[in-house]
Amino acid sequence: MGYAGIAGIAFVESGFLVGFFLPGDSLLFAAGFLASAGTIDLELVIIAAFLGAVLGDSFGYMLGFRLGPKVFKKENSFIFHKSHIERAQNFYEKHGGKTIVIARFLPIIRTFAPVLAGVGKMKYSAFVFYNIFGGLLWTISLTVLGFILGGIFPNLHNYILFVILGIIIISVAPTMIGVLKNKQYREYIKKHWKNLLNTQKSPE
């Protein structure tokens, strides 16, 4: 994947409304784990992830600032649901600017928090402060944790692919379970699945 890939994933997950499904936490942990084996450089991983995350949040802020309330009118789809916005909005109203920092460690909310900060016209200087602080805290803590555990359990490097796969599954599982439990998501999937089957059955 490389450092550019790490930065890219951190950027998309933080800055795009459809990036919430990307496994940012597990990516940083796995990158730190690989760094402990000398496969990649820990400092460069942190720099790449930090830049991607901070720039992504800034993009999300500008998106919300320019679109304003239109964000709340976006139609539901398989990869976007208004409930994600509402969940992040409730969290933002409760914690204010600190949401930008706290949300770094909360999948889904992490993606929508900067957008809501833009919609709410948070003072940009305050947003930048929380954004940089949260980005540093997130990237350093997760990559260093992976690095430390990689040093404690060096034999796990022989099974690195299984370790990464396991981390991704654990990271993505809560989101997938939430999707399956959501009635509107299930109805959306059923509707489009039936349309797909009908299209395949229709004569040419």
Show the residue positions of the predicted features.
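Membrane-interfacial helix-loop-helix
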Residues: M1-G8, F33-A126, G151-V163, P174-E204
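Transmembrane alpha-helix interface/packing and boundary motifs in multi-pass membrane proteins
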Residues: A7-P23, S171
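Short, amphipathic, aromatic/basic-enriched membrane-interface segments that mark the entry/exit
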Residues: G15-F21, I100, V128-L136
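Re-entrant/interfacial helical elements at transmembrane boundaries that shape
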Residues: G19-F33, F112-G120, G146
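Hydrophobic alpha-helical transmembrane bundles that constitute the permease/transmembrane domains
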Residues: I108-F112, I132, L136-I140
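Transmembrane alpha-helical segments of integral membrane proteins
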Residues: T139-L149
